[in-house]
Structure formats: C-alpha cells, structure tokens
A protein has these predicted regions:
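A short, internal acetyl-CoA/4′-phosphopantetheine-binding micro-motif in the GNAT/acyltransferase core
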Residues: 55, 71-85, 104-105
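Conserved catalytic-core motifs of GNAT/GCN5-like acyltransferases
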Residues: 103, 121-129
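Conserved GNAT acetyl-CoA-binding A-motif
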Residues: 96-107
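Conserved beta-hairpin
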Residues: 50-67
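Long, contiguous binding/interaction regions
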Residues: 64-67, 103, 114
Length: 129
C-alpha cells in the first residue's frame, strides 16, 4: 500500500463530510454531526488548508486536520481501518505544527493506540455522557 497526504481541495470535501457522518465513525467523535453539503462547503472554504487527505494507492482513505488552531482531528474510512492509515496520517501531519493536542474519547481505544504508538503522552481522557 502506498500512502500519501494531499491537500484537501474541493474535490475531497464531500468525501470528508460523508466520512465524518458515517455511523461507524460517529462513535469515535465527541459530538454527533449532521452536516449538509452547504455547511461543509462553507466550513472548508475557511479551513481547507488545515486539512489533508490520505490517499492509499490513489484512493481517499481518510482525513487529518486541525481544529481551533491546536486540536488534531482525523478519521479513517471503515474500509481502511486497521491498516496503519491513522498512524500514517498523524505521523506525517503533526510535525507541521509546533504544538497540537489530541482529544480522544475514553472508549476510542484504536485512536488511543495510534497516539501512544507515536510517542504522544497521555494527559487525561474525558468521558462523553
């Protein structure tokens, strides 16, 4: 598998929206999201340079980005989960920023493992009610 990060140009905005709203992926986020195409376009027009798309053999497999200027967010397509895509994205993306945080749900073990594998230090996990 050949992986690379590319800019999150307009051709990928709908991919990001659908991936974020995928019921399998919703469990990994703190908030449930219902995002319209119009909302996605508006958001990405302002924030597209804070996001990258991971291509695996040329196919979009996930995204990684920065929220609030310091909070890393990422999501992997269910078809590519467990194949190192999340680890690759965090490893490639995070050196771009001097300081970033990762907020991970206490029950999101897969994401915890990604960050710990890359040497991130656990501070605290919040429990979503």
């Amino acid at each position: 598998m050949k992986m690379k990060l590319v800019n999150c140009t307009e051709q990928y905005w709908e991919f990001v929206r659908k991936l974020r709203m995928n019921p399998i992926n919703q469990e990994g986020f703190f908030t449930y999201a219902e995002i319209t195409s119009e909302q996605q376009e508006s958001y990405m027009l302002k924030n597209q340079w804070d996001y990258k798309i991971c291509l695996v053999d040329g196919e979009p497999a996930g995204y990684v980005g920065l929220l609030k200027g310091h909070e890393i967010t990422y999501c992997v397509s269910p078809d590519f989960q467990g194949k190192g895509v999340g680890t690759f994205m965090i490893e490639e993306f995070s050196p771009r920023w001097a300081w970033v945080d990762a907020l991970v749900k206490v029950d999101n073990i897969a994401s915890q493992k990604v960050f710990e594998k890359l040497g991130w230090k656990k501070q605290i996990y919040y429990r979503n009610k």
